[in-house]
Amino acid sequence: MDVAMRVEWLATPRVILGIGAGWVAYALCLDPLRHIPGPRLNAVSMIPYARHLLAGTTVQNSVSLHQQYGEVVRIAPNEVSLICGETAFPDIYGRLFITSQTMGQIRANSAVCRVSDGKDERASKYVQGRRVLAHAFSDKALMGQEPLVQRYVDQLIDRLKEVTSANDEPVDMVKWYNWTTFDVIADLLFGEPFGCLQDLSTHQYVALLFQSLKSLRMIYILAYYPWLRFLGNLIVDKGLIQKRKEYATWVSTQVTKRINTATPRPDFMSHILANNNNRGVKLTRAEIDSNATLMTTAGSETTATLLSGATYLLLTHPRVLRTLQDEIHSEFPTYESITLEAVAKRTPYLNAVISEALRFFPPIPVGFIRRVPKGGETVSGYWIPEGTILSVSHYAAYHSERNFRDPDSWVPERWLGDERYVNDKRAAFQPFSFGPRSCLGRNLAYAEMRLILAKMVWSFEMELDEGLSRDWLQRCRVMRLWQKPELEVRVRPRVVA
């Protein structure tokens, strides 16, 4: 080896170390985000955040970071997490900030679920697209959809009675709630269910959704580092990619079938078709298909997650369960008297249970990420430069003493005027997000939550299988949404005097 080659070989590590040292110095001393509190390692590298992302512990880590550093924390070199109750939601979600390109690569290309630039004409298209879909989720539309929702809730109750009458074995309520909510949303969208409750099995495309969730963590990391994106094809299962293509084709076929089928009953598609091209606003067929795919997930999995969490919390808090049983049994002398209107207006404790379950175990635990537009913005009192990724972590915000007293205690009474919780910052509680991109399906979600929990409590005595599911909540992991283990519950028909 000649002298020149030896010098070049020895210099290479030094160059690498020099570049690394320069980057560290820049990130800590010169970077526009250097004034944001947070761990120094997180300011320099994505690795600490990625480690928790892969482990499914991002929300627990967010709670810890906000406890240590405050309401605004730099969690990655170009990402900031906020939990400020009064300012974070309106500052980030109350205006049409740009949806981050990081998640834009994961989402479908839809006029409603994706906007490239929050301050140009495409933002207007986004708002217009929501107007078309909003008719399907109105209070009036929900009343017309009640018979369909009731039918599947009744099927849930009937099938549980059939299965549990034969033996005293526990059943996995995570699975049963998913079957119910996916059947409801499929019938509302396509005019026919997945058939999960009928067959007591998970439809192949429902299973595909849960398989896909496991890939989101790695896709997120790869999207953060453009020079690593070529690894995506090596990491993501090619069979899974093919199944996703098959699912998209299946959704399009189902939409076509529903469009070509006349039906007197109101459902999502009837409202979309009736209001499309209203006042010159029209979704293309591709956008209808894309939003049907989105609504299949958003209108089912998150509701089932809340129901699973609420059931676990009720069964591990006997006093709360007894109070809820007393309310349901006294308000509804018969099973048939449980209607959407009745559970909304006559069951304050049930509604408090749902609100507290949404706070304690939010179905979407992480924040919807946004990118600060050109020129930068002031957010929660901090100047944030353009291009920075922002989000409000729901789980961290709801489990912070800065926003809620006794944040790690499950107390439905906090929503019923208990004076101990009068100083809770309700503005920090936004389980369906906030502003022009807030969840359109909140009315349907609340309706399903109330109706299913009320009829489950009215119909059954439930008991958690302590051996299998005692630590269920602790074993849940976050893959953007919750990955939930089996929730084994013994369900026995209630004896009505």
UniProtKB/Swiss-Prot annotation:
Keyword match Metal-binding: yes
Alphabetized UniProt keyword annotations: Heme, Iron, Membrane, Metal-binding, Monooxygenase, Oxidoreductase, Transmembrane, Transmembrane helix
Bilayer disposition of the protein: Single-pass membrane protein
Native source organism of the sequence: Aspergillus niger (strain ATCC MYA-4892 / CBS 513.88 / FGSC A1513)
Induction (free text): Expression is positively regulated by the cluster-specific transcription factor caaR.
Origin: domain of life: Eukaryota
Lineage, uppermost ranks: Eukaryota, Fungi, Dikarya, Ascomycota, Pezizomycotina
Subcellular location: Membrane
Protein name: Cytochrome P450 monooxygenase caaC
Enzyme class: oxidoreductase
Principal cellular location given in the protein's record: membrane
Pathway where it operates: Secondary metabolite biosynthesis
Its EC number(s): 1.14.-.-
